[in-house]
Structures are given as structure tokens and as C-alpha cells.
């Protein structure tokens, strides 16, 4: 046999205080909520974030005309 599996308790590793504190965060591993869950909410926030990025890009490219807003580093120093 090429590989050997061991079920001994010596291979469990070291238990640390940090591992004990973080164990509850990993207790839901492998469990899947039925249905779509919060996927629609995530989609809404992704769409809002995309709109935000487009607005920032348009301001950066001066595609959106903003009155009385200077787009230079010198205006920030005043």
C-alpha cells in the first residue's frame, strides 16, 4: 500500500487558546442553508457598488460636470 492512514490521537496537533476562541466560527462549516438565502441581497449590494464605481469613474474622467469643483491637486492644497 502506497499510503498509510493513521487514526491515532497523537496526530491531532497542538491545542491553542486562539484555536479554542476561533472554533465557534468554524462550527457551521459544510452546512448549506436551503434556498437562495441572502443571494438576492448580495446581488443588490453588488449592483449598488457597481453604480458607485461608475460614478467615481465618471467624476475622475470629468464626464460629469461639477460646478465649482476643481479637479487638480493644487485646489486641494488651498
Swiss-Prot record:
The chain crosses the membrane at residues 39-59. It is a single-pass membrane protein. GO terms for cellular component: chloroplast thylakoid membrane; photosystem II. The keyword Transport does not apply. Gene3D superfamilies: Photosystem II reaction center protein H (1.20.5.880). GO terms for molecular function: phosphate ion binding. GO terms for biological process: photosynthesis; protein stabilization. Phosphorylation is a light-dependent reaction catalyzed by a membrane-bound kinase; phosphorylation occurs on Thr residue(s) in the N-terminus of the protein. This is Photosystem II reaction center protein H. PSII is composed of 1 copy each of membrane proteins PsbA, PsbB, PsbC, PsbD, PsbE, PsbF, PsbH, PsbI, PsbJ, PsbK, PsbL, PsbM, PsbT, PsbX, PsbY, PsbZ, Psb30/Ycf12, at least 3 peripheral proteins of the oxygen-evolving complex and a large number of cofactors. It forms dimeric complexes. InterPro entries: PSII_PsbH, PSII_PsbH_sf. NCBIfam families: PRK02624.1 (NF002728). Belongs to the PsbH family. The modification Phosphothreonine is found at residue 3. One of the components of the core complex of photosystem II (PSII), required for its stability and/or assembly. PSII is a light-driven water:plastoquinone oxidoreductase that uses light energy to abstract electrons from H(2)O, generating O(2) and a proton gradient subsequently used for ATP formation. It consists of a core antenna complex that captures photons, and an electron transfer chain that converts photonic excitation into a charge separation. It comes from Tupiella akineta (Green alga). Keywords: Chloroplast, Membrane, Phosphoprotein, Photosynthesis, Photosystem II, Plastid, Thylakoid, Transmembrane, Transmembrane helix. It is found in: Plastid, Chloroplast thylakoid membrane. The gene is psbH. It comes from the Eukaryota.
